[in-house]
């Protein structure tokens, strides 16, 4: 890279550094957003494995709506249900380099309403 990191990559590094400092060995709720879909997963970094995951690619969500805020909220709700079934209540929210706005915020709010604490 001739010029260094892009703004997105610098923001992602800054968020991850903060998570490592404040994480206290909690599982990490990682969010990835594309133009068509949103993906979320709860990752246990100590064991290096994904505990639960949800996305708008799932048939039940995909049939209802596409890349909308409502679809992101439904994904957050499903993720919270699966996490509570796996015994996870407290997580650290990893938004990656994405701004906390729109679909990312809708997913986070729905996950909080579903019982996840962050």
Curated annotation (Swiss-Prot):
Keyword flag NAD: no
Domain of life where this protein originates: Bacteria
GO cellular component terms, semicolon-separated: cytoplasm; ribonucleoprotein complex; ribosome
Example GO molecular function: structural constituent of ribosome
Keywords: Ribonucleoprotein, Ribosomal protein, RNA-binding, rRNA-binding
SS bonds (residue pairs): none
Quaternary data: Part of the 50S ribosomal subunit; part of the 5S rRNA/L5/L18/L25 subcomplex. Contacts the 5S and 23S rRNAs.
Full protein name: Large ribosomal subunit protein uL18
Organism: Zymomonas mobilis subsp. mobilis (strain ATCC 31821 / ZM4 / CP4)
Chain's gene name: rplR
